[in-house]
Amino acid sequence: MPEARDRTERPVDYSTIFANRRRHGILLDEPDSRLSLIESPVNPDIGSIGGTGGLVRGNFTTWRPGNGRGGHTPFRLPQGRENMPIVTARRGRGGGLLPSWYPRTPLRDITHIVRAIERRRGAGTGGDDGRVIEIPTHRQVGVLESPVPLSGEHKCSMVTPGPSVGFKRSCPPSTAKVQKMLLDITKEIAEEEAGFITPEKKLLNSIDKVEKIVMAEIQKLKSTPQAKREEREKRVRTLMTMR
């Protein structure tokens, strides 16, 4: 029985192989003895094997599982180039870190979503008059920076809410007086809403009134006998430490 063709030993002329590789830029069929057990065999096309040196004039195809082209993926070496890695076609959209099934959508404008959230909040808190709170866009930045007040600003409440009904706290009488005065200020501001007042002016008026009330309460506390006694004890301690 004749010996199999894949076991036939042929002399290899390395100078001719190197010259053909440089001239044609094609992949050469190395001897079978040089193929390691890990490498996948290269299957040349039938009728494309020449008689000298085992040169392959056609395309090389490597077996790859799960391919729709009969299990082979053809590739070619670039003509006229040396030491270039073989680049195979990829099915993904690039060499990114995300997997191929991850949705890659462009950034969307979420302004309408934010407006819907703000509209729902306004309807739940103080939107009884049907006003819609909108998020300013880039074109409205210049309008917002203007000193002219926008519609719906006089409806904003910038004051401290009163204590909840049915909830009692143990607080000193001075604090109770301050809370009562704050409630009076809230009522005054509610009465002044008939006239047009900006939230900034309303806030400044509230701060001034609260500051005056607090300073008056502090002066009253300093004039009490207990406060005078504490002040005298503090001075005595300071003098004793200076001895």
From Swiss-Prot:
A GO-annotated cellular component: nucleus
Superkingdom as given in the UniProt entry: Eukaryota
Source organism of the structure: Arabidopsis thaliana
Residue stretches spanning the membrane: none
Keywords: Cell cycle, Cell division, Developmental protein, DNA replication, Meiosis, Mitosis, Phosphoprotein, Plant defense
GO biological process assignments: cell division; defense response; DNA replication; endomitotic cell cycle; endosperm development; megagametogenesis; meiosis I; meiosis II
Record protein name field: Protein GIGAS CELL1
Tissue: Expressed in rapidly dividing tissues such as shoot apical meristem and young leaves. Associated with cell division but also with specific cell types.
Subunit structure, interactors included: Interacts with APC/C activators such as FZR1, FZR2, FZR3, CDC20.1 and CDC20.5.
Purpose: Negative regulator of the anaphase-promoting complex/cyclosome (APC/C) ubiquitin ligase required for proper mitotic and meiotic progression and cell fate determination. Involved in entry into both meiosis I and meiosis II. Prevents endomitosis by preferentially inhibiting APC/C(CDC20). Required for megagametophyte and endosperm development. Triggers mitotic cyclins (e.g. CYCB1-1 and CYCB1-2) accumulation. Confers immunity to bacterial pathogens (e.g. Pseudomonas syringae pv. tomato DC3000), which is associated with increased expression of disease resistance (R) genes.
InterPro entries, alphabetized: POLYCHOME/GIG1
Keyword Zinc applies: no
Record PTM: Phosphorylated by CDKA-1 in complex with CYCA1-2.
Consequence of gene loss (knockout): Ectopic endomitosis during somatic cell division leading to gigas cells, large guard cells, and round cells containing large polyploid nuclei in cotyledons. Enhancer of the myb3r4 mutant phenotype. Enhancer of bon1-2 phenotype, leading to dwarf and bushy phenotype with many lateral shoots. Production of diploid gametes by skipping the second meiotic division; male meiosis leads to dyads instead of tetrads, and selfed progeny provides tetraploids (4n) and triploids (3n), but no diploid (2n) plants.
Keyword Isomerase among UniProt keywords: no
